[in-house]
């Protein structure tokens, strides 16, 4: 099984034009912060995920680098702990699933059942 060799995280501002009037916010949003995560394995495959902004993840990358890329149960347990302490690491979860799907040659929806 391949191992995770790198995690690349970039943060972006998605411009909303026209502004988006979210039902929970009285001010229309003109931009939305997002994160794109790229996870690369030792076989050169890359999984990509995106979602809510992920600040401060660098301290936690060591819990994934060198680990089996396809061990999704393990990764989910680590992500649940990170979520409790640091918040919103779910773009990484999506990238890990994307990588697992590419490794298996299946779409993620099929792997989920």
Question: Which sequence ranges carry the predicted segments?
Answer:
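Metal- or metallocofactor-binding catalytic centers and their adjacent structured scaffolds
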Residues: 6, 38-107
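Short, intrinsically disordered, charge-balanced linker/junction segments flanking boundaries
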Residues: 109-113
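Structured beta-strand/loop patches that form or line metal/cofactor-binding pockets in enzymes
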Residues: 1-47
